[in-house]
From Swiss-Prot:
Predominant subcellular localization, coarse grouping: membrane
Name of the protein this chain belongs to: Elongation factor 4
Gene3D superfamilies in alphabetical order: 3.30.70.240, Elongation factor 4, C-terminal domain, Elongation Factor G (Translational Gtpase), domain 3, P-loop containing nucleotide triphosphate hydrolases, Translation factors
Alphabetical GO biological process terms: positive regulation of translation
Entry-linked PROSITE patterns: G_TR_1, G_TR_2
Species this protein is from: Aliivibrio salmonicida (strain LFI1238) (Vibrio salmonicida (strain LFI1238))
Length: 597
């Protein structure tokens, strides 16, 4: 056991986590040179295309250190994006230490801080590593000072390396062996294993990634899942060397995968404990706090025949992604679908893209909303995650919106731009600290503003230098209203949005103008209106197509022309009563972009 090291790699987006993990695998000979591909651990196509890590991946390597001993290194590569921070906390629960990778050119950024504090709260040993020292812009001494100043951990002695060229990677491995403590646990005691992650394999059923805390797991053991109490037989067990390799068992402190032939998706929830069916442990391991979705949107299959497939696909995806929440929803405009909860806009895009790619579905998304706390006149408290569920204006006493605490790190020269952006987003300043050239800003900004396009705007206003980390703080009383869209005086439930009263007029007008571009012209006028309750705040009309009925009269009596025009008018009127308007997919997407440009 004293030769096992469990660690994860944490860093801000693009500071070189995945490249460093590639190098570690190569140096330890986990894969032959021929199998080596850039970003080995980013196994989803989507991860490679966007160049980001979405799912945490684990690898077991054997490393012979300078002292002649062979160590088993289990490491877990984690995502850096703010939407996936729950993946990071899950990975950290399985480790004794973490490598904090910092780009020697860019220095400390918001995500570095957030992940580092998560690790320190879990009592992990945090080892700073300065990466990208081969860049001309690298200034390791300044960055080391920055780490000490902002993060507050010893960094002058930090290992320096360049994951791209492979310089200093051996030193990193030595540091891991020296600085990260060996796992503690009782090899003889009753078995306890923590499920870090699970996914669904069409042949094997549920595959779980586990970390054995006490005891051991062997092939053909009878084990039980503690939350459900069901017993299973261990069919296959093994490790990743990135490839799945079968072994006879896992001992205390090791990380590996287990297949028990569980076919039910809810059979082995993430964060649960596995133990032996007979003589197992009594207590469950402390799991992870459940993450609450911050953004909700309706997802509907374009053809209603896909509904069953869509439901199965969501089930399989939610096994792999513990933070995805979904419940059935029906809409008069779009038919049957699901109301899904996500951690942020990137998460929502990724899930939608994974559903469309991996399960071959065509989906329509409604506008994303956050969760509002609503107090009714009779004192009841409701949580509303969809504009359609918001009660009528006369029943409402107050609406409270969620406020996010945003920590922003920005170079001093872009401070003005960032502050004016925060004010435009109805933010209030909490704190501002100068660290050399960097400024740490803390703002309270309504979640609905953060979720929409705050991240993109922040990046563009600071030329990509500002970085953001946010978490839910509290609910606060606010003047929110629901803006409904009426098409020919009929409410379309899927187009409603909840917005602040001050922005309602502008958002309503933008929405109506946007809709006008996308709805095709019909044989009659289509009135598009935005309304708050019964009060219309904006309107535009899609003009009818009409035939020139008086073209065939030349000269002649005016009454003849009047008769033809009246006949046309009556026909159009009749048509308008029975005609209905088909809304194209683009019209629903139009709402997503309101207020972006």
């Amino acid at each position: 056991m004293k030769h096992i090291r469990n660690f994860s790699i944490i860093a801000h987006i693009d500071h070189g986590k995945s490249t460093l993990s590639d190098r570690l695998i190569q140096v330890c000979g986990g894969l032959s040179d021929r199998e080596m591909a850039a970003q080995v651990l980013d196994s989803m196509d989507l991860e490679r295309e966007r160049g980001i890590t979405i799912k945490a991946q684990s690898v077991t390597l054997n490393y012979t250190a300078n002292d002649g001993e062979t160590y088993q290194l289990n490491f877990i590569d984690t995502p850096g994006h703010v939407d996936f921070s729950y993946e990071v906390s899950r990975s950290l629960a399985a480790c004794e230490g973490a490598l904090l990778v910092v780009d020697a050119g860019q220095g400390v950024e918001a995500q570095t801080l957030a992940n580092c504090y998560t690790a320190l709260e879990m009592d992990l040993e945090v080892v700073p590593i300065l990466n990208k020292i081969d860049l001309p812009a690298a200034d390791p001494d300044r960055v080391a000072e920055e780490i000490e100043d902002i993060v507050g951990i010893e960094a002058m002695e930090a290992t320096r390396c360049s994951a791209k060229t492979g310089l200093g990677v051996d030193a990193v491995l030595e540091t891991i062996v020296k600085c990260i403590p060996a796992p503690e646990g009782n090899p003889e005691g009753p078995t306890q294993a923590l499920i870090i992650d699970s996914w669904f394999d069409n042949y094997l059923g549920v595959v779980s990634l586990v970390r054995v805390k006490h005891g051991s797991l062997k092939k053909n053991d009878k084990i039980k899942v503690m939350s459900t109490g069901q017993a299973w037989n261990v069919d296959r067990i093994g490790i990743f060397t990135p490839k799945q390799v079968d072994t006879d068992g896992l001992n205390t402190g090791e990380v590996g995968w287990v297949v028990c032939g569980i076919k039910d998706i809810l059979g082995a929830p993430v964060g649960d404990t596995l133990t032996h069916a007979k003589g197992g442990c009594e207590e469950r391991l402390p799991g992870f706090q459940k993450v609450k979705p911050q953004v909700y949107a309706g997802l509907f299959p374009i053809s209603s025949d896909d509904y069953e497939n869509f439901r199965d696909a969501l089930g399989k995806l939610s096994l792999n992604d513990a933070s995805l929440f979904y419940e059935p929803e029906s809409s008069s405009a779009l038919g049957f679908g699901f109301r899904c909860g996500f951690l942020g806009m990137l998460h929502m895009e990724i899930i939608q893209e994974r559903l469309e790619r991996e399960y071959d579905l065509d989906l329509i998304t409604t506008a994303p909303t956050v969760v509002y706390e609503v107090v009714l006149n009779n004192g009841d408290l409701l949580y509303v995650d969809s504009p359609a569920k918001l009660p009528a204006v006369n029943d409402l006493d107050e609406i409270r919106e969620p406020i996010a605490r945003c920590n922003i790190l920005v170079p001093a020269e872009y401070l003005g731009n960032v502050i004016s952006l925060c004010i435009e987003k109805r933010g209030t300043q909490v704190d501002m600290i100068y660290h050399g050239n960097q400024v740490a800003l803390t703002y309270d900004i309504p979640m609905s503003e953060v979720v929409l396009d705050f991240f993109d705007r922040l990046k563009s206003t600071s030329r990509g230098y500002a970085s953001l980390d946010y978490n839910f703080q509290r609910y606060e009383l606010s003047n929110m209203v629901r803006v409904d869209v009426l098409i020919n005086a009929e409410r379309v439930d899927a187009l409603a949005i909840i917005t602040h009263h001050d922005n309602a007029q502008g958002r309503g007008r933008l929405l109506v103008e946007k809709m006008k571009e996308f709805i095709p012209r019909q044989m009659f006028d289509i009135a598009i209106q935005a309304a708050i309750g019964g009060h219309i705040i904006a309107r535009s009309t899609v003009k009818q197509l009409r035939k020139n009925v008086i073209a065939k009269c030349y000269g002649g009596d005016i009454s003849r022309k009047k008769k033809l025009l009246k006949k046309q008018k009556d026909g159009k009127k009749r048509m308008k009563q029975i005609g209905n308007v088909e809304l194209p997919q683009e019209a629903f997407l139009a709402i997503l972009h309101v207020g972006k440009d």
